[in-house]
Amino acid sequence: MEGFFWKTLLVVGALAIGGTSSLPHKPLTYEEAVDLAVSIYNSKSGEDSLYRLLEAVPPPEWDPLSESNQELNFTIKETVCLVAEERSLEECDFQEDGAIMGCTGYYFFGESPPVLVLTCKPVGEEEEQKQEEGNEEEKEVEKEEKEEDEKDQPRRVKRFKKFFKKLKNSVKKRAKKFFKKPRVIGVSIPF
């Protein structure tokens, strides 16, 4: 009888071990993954205001049980709540003119613990910059034409001035783009 008990215990133990999940992480639905990413953005971005999910479209290939990399794409918007208040996001309304951020995140579930890399940048900022740059260029061209008409300078001097102004504008644009980097956050996720 004693041998039967140990054999039974061995079989039950083997089944229990084989029946447990071999995943190194807790399975996440797309909604849970996005909520976690928004929470991490709010805690690590250094912003004064909390951001809340505006839109998220789950990709058809999202697999909560996958051990491979998973991609997130979502949009968040600034709320009236401050980070220091530590309020629930459900209590926070969107700001009327709040900043809207387009975010892309990558979960690396193959790592132990899993890692999230999140990149968020303002939506529509590129279009606004192009419009501003176009307006500035037009104003400068008009200003240059007026200056050239007023002064009676040799043609060579005018060409050099025009060239250096274009060069100066180009450097300004590149400097603006360089210093307006999107926020990138990387964290490991303990499950």
From Swiss-Prot:
Xref: InterPro entries: Cathelicidin-like, Cystatin_sf
Gene3D superfamilies per the UniProt record, alphabetical: 3.10.450.10
Any one GO cellular component localisation term in the record: other organism cell membrane
Secreted among keywords: yes
Major localisation: secreted
Cystine bridges: C81-C92, C103-C120
Biased composition (Acidic residues): 125-151
Region Disordered, residue ranges: 125-154
Propeptide: 23-161
Compartments, record wording: Secreted; Target cell membrane
Keyword annotations from UniProtKB, A to Z: Antibiotic, Antimicrobial, Cleavage on pair of basic residues, Disulfide bond, Membrane, Secreted, Signal, Target cell membrane, Target membrane
Pfam families on file: Cathelicidins (PF00666)
Tissues where the protein occurs: Expressed by the venom gland.
Position of the signal peptide: 1-22
BP-aspect Gene Ontology terms: defense response to bacterium; defense response to fungus; innate immune response; killing of cells of another organism
Purpose of the protein: Potent antimicrobial peptide against Gram-negative (MIC=0.25 ug/ml against E.coli ATCC 25922, MIC=0.5 ug/ml against P.aeruginosa) and Gram-positive bacteria (MIC=64 ug/ml against E.faecalis, MIC=64 ug/ml against S.aureus). Adopts an amphipathic alpha helical conformation, that may allow to partition into the target membrane. Low hemolytic activities have been observed on mammalian cells.
Similarity annotation: Belongs to the cathelicidin family.
Other comments on record: The peptide length (30 residues) shown here is propagated from the directly sequenced mature cathelicidin-BF. A longer peptide (34 residues) with predicted cleavage site located at position Val-157-158-Lys is proposed in PubMed:18620012. This 30 residues peptide could result from a further processing. The putative mature sequence has been predicted by AMPA, a predictive algorithm for identification of peptide stretches with antimicrobial properties.
Protein name per the record: Cathelicidin-related peptide Oh-Cath
Taxon lineage: Eukaryota, Metazoa, Chordata, Craniata, Vertebrata
